[in-house]
Design a protein with these regions (language model features):
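Gly/Pro-rich, tryptophan- and cysteine-flecked surface segments typical
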Residues: 137-138, 150-151, 208
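Hydrophobic, proline/glycine-rich low-complexity stretches
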Residues: 1-18, 211-216
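Acidic, contiguous internal or C-terminal segments within carbohydrate-active enzymes
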Residues: 19, 141-170
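Charged surface patches that recognize polyanionic ligands
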Residues: 7-14, 22-144
Length: 216
């Protein structure tokens, strides 16, 4: 991916640092239990992703749960998140805009859009003296990080994902991300699961890779 576009003069959007791994197959109950050490909210939703030309991979567009149009701009990668022996993934910098979208009747998916069903468990953390602690969402702009464990259904196939998304002041995004990952990975994942860079990608990159595999 390549960074794209300058800041909009109208709005800065929401800046974030993110790491995500997406793996094939059903989510194992033991992994859900490992994640369940922390309080989490669970929701099911269906997002629809616009399938763009690979050259525009740094500009993903989706309709979130039929209620909001979201546009993200990739701002580059500041490096690798590494928890020795447990996880290694690409840190990605993003800027996101969200626009309300009225719900439509019917469940048809226009050409060029790919529906993705998600059952999401989301645990939220805030920073306290440089350490991550479980917390409810604070006021907008405060440093924090969401950890997300998601069961994915797409085109009749099962996948699962673990991701972290840090938001708040730009200077604290990296601290929030790494502190939350350190807390989450303080315990080994069940079954010796190790998350590697080969599975570390955004939803847009994953969808493009799946499409390439189908047409190979």
């Amino acid at each position: 991916m390549t960074a794209a576009f300058a800041d909009s003069p109208a709005t800065a959007g929401v800046r974030s640092l993110e790491v995500r791994w997406i793996l094939p197959g059903q989510l194992e109950p033991a992994v859900a239990g490992w994640f369940g050490r922390f309080p989490a909210q669970t929701e099911y939703r269906q997002d629809s992703y616009l399938l763009l030309d690979p050259a525009l991979g740094g500009l993903p567009v989706k309709v979130r749960a039929g209620r909001a149009l979201e546009v993200k701009v990739y701002r580059g990668s500041p490096g690798i998140l590494e928890v020795t022996g447990r996880a290694r993934g690409h840190i990605q910098s993003w800027q996101k805009w969200s626009f309300p979208r009225p719900l439509r009747q019917g469940s048809d998916d226009p050409a060029g859009w790919r529906p993705v069903g998600k059952t999401r468990r989301v645990a939220r953390f805030c920073l306290a003296d440089g350490r991550a602690v479980p917390a409810v969402p604070g006021p907008a702009g405060e440093p924090g990080c969401a950890a997300e464990l998601t069961e994915i259904r797409m085109a009749g196939q099962a996948w699962w994902s673990l991701g972290f998304e840090a938001t708040g002041p730009a200077g604290l995004l990296g601290t929030a991300l790494r502190a939350t990952a350190a807390l989450m990975f303080a315990h080994d994942m069940p079954g010796g699961t190790e998350l590697a860079t080969g599975h570390s990608k955004s939803y847009a990159e994953w969808l493009a890779a799946v499409a390439d595999a189908v047409h190979a």
